[in-house]
Amino acid sequence: MNIISVGVNHKTAPIEIRERISLSEVQNKEFITGLISGGLAHEAMVLSTCNRTELYVVPAMHEVTGEYLKDYIISFRDARKDVRPEHFFSRFYCGTARHLFEVSSAIDSLILGEGQILGQVKEAYRIAAEVQAAGILITRLCHTAFSVAKKVKTKTKIMEGAVSVSYAAVELAQKIFSNLSMKKILLVGAGETGELAAKHMFAKNARNIVITNRTQSKAEALAEELGTNRVLPFESYKEHLHEFDIIITAVSTKDYIITEADMHGAMQKRRLKPVIILDLGLPRNADPEIGKLQNMFLKDIDALKHIIDKNLERRSLELPKVHSIIDEELVAFGQWINTLKVRPTIVDLQSKFIEIKEKELERYRYKVSEEELRRMEHLTDRIMKKILHHPIKMLKAPISTSDNMPSRVDLVRNVFDLEEPNQSH
């Protein structure tokens, strides 16, 4: 009935170790099917991302411990030269459930509240289910984790506020110009940072985006992806600065690509209509003197990082609420686990009483009328349910600190002389 979790993540191991243990989808399927076909596990799932590789296993043998699973995956990845057991964490029973709930809720992420992890957990579950490795325990564990993540997202603010430079830039632009769909935007630089900023803008309903890049084909590819198909030659974009309400720069360069003189002329043509320049370059792309011009809002990476720090601080204040949700769901999950543990005993108890009832009724089958037999059957059913009510209620009751589930199960099995159950999980 145990659920073990072992793995490496950004807290326990550096990236070069995490890379050695990570599994592709094909390797993931091979790994978990090997555990099950080898008789080592009843159920298994692997969550493998850039920041973590974690095993969730319902062992089929007492020998399959946390240490055993660490050694098993190290051997599977042929990583003995690089990876040691100390790089791993281990969780057991409800500790495993708590860990997955925290992971799914994005409070165990490298960036607090980074919501991408939930999709990755769902993908891990899909893979396990696809190869019939997700049984009743892992299925319930994962669906509870999905429910926890949904509650955390709707009932807390742990995922609110930008925590990346590109998203912080867009969030700031939206605060200054509330309706981005009405603004004309110039993106200078179509690299990774610029692309992210453009996609965040697009997600905020900005559609009037013009792109310029030293390599024009790269600008054209991004414009096509966004569906704007609007590109300016890099050699001539400065001639159009006055046309834009928002300018995002994300270019690798030693010199300023937009000077104070460039924007002074642009502002005169705009008749001082406000402009935001979001400088995502390092070194900076825009001359800091631009910020002194009237109706000019210039924000560089340092200013945006200040916004990010504030947002992370606000997110951390939500942690008590998140833990409260997790604690509540953990209690319910633990109670379900306990019910699962006693299910064989409840079934055996009911079966024994049904067997006794049927044997006794059989003795009178030819001594009484069919109507009398039906009445006797109805009466014995009622008596049986009343007798069984209390022992079943006791078995299902939550465990207190002075009690434990095995002693309850043993008591009932001994009192009612039940045969030892077959151990499956």
UniProtKB/Swiss-Prot annotation:
Where does this protein act, in terms of pathway? Answer: Porphyrin-containing compound metabolism; protoporphyrin-IX biosynthesis; 5-aminolevulinate from L-glutamyl-tRNA(Glu): step 1/2; Porphyrin-containing compound metabolism; chlorophyll biosynthesis
This molecule's function is given as: Catalyzes the NADPH-dependent reduction of glutamyl-tRNA(Glu) to glutamate 1-semialdehyde (GSA).
Q: Which reaction does it catalyse?
A: (S)-4-amino-5-oxopentanoate + tRNA(Glu) + NADP(+) = L-glutamyl-tRNA(Glu) + NADPH + H(+)
| EC assignment | 1.2.1.70
Q: Which domain of life does this protein belong to?
A: Bacteria
Q: What taxonomic lineage is listed for the species of origin?
A: Bacteria, Pseudomonadati, Chlorobiota, Chlorobiia, Chlorobiales
Q: InterPro entries attached here?
A: 4pyrrol_synth_GluRdtase (IPR000343), 4pyrrol_synth_GluRdtase_dimer (IPR015896), 4pyrrol_synth_GluRdtase_N (IPR015895), GluRdtase_CS (IPR018214), GluRdtase_dimer_dom_sf (IPR036453), GluRdtase_N_sf (IPR036343), NAD(P)-bd_dom_sf (IPR036291), Shikm_DH/Glu-tRNA_Rdtase (IPR006151)
Query: How would you summarize the oligomeric state and partners of this protein?
Result: Homodimer.
Q: Which CDD domains match?
A: NAD_bind_Glutamyl_tRNA_reduct (cd05213)
Q: What is known of its domains?
A: Possesses an unusual extended V-shaped dimeric structure with each monomer consisting of three distinct domains arranged along a curved 'spinal' alpha-helix. The N-terminal catalytic domain specifically recognizes the glutamate moiety of the substrate. The second domain is the NADPH-binding domain, and the third C-terminal domain is responsible for dimerization.
User: What's the top EC group for this one?
Assistant: oxidoreductase
List site positions: Important for activity. Answer: H99
Q: From the Swiss-Prot or TrEMBL record, give the protein name.
A: Glutamyl-tRNA reductase
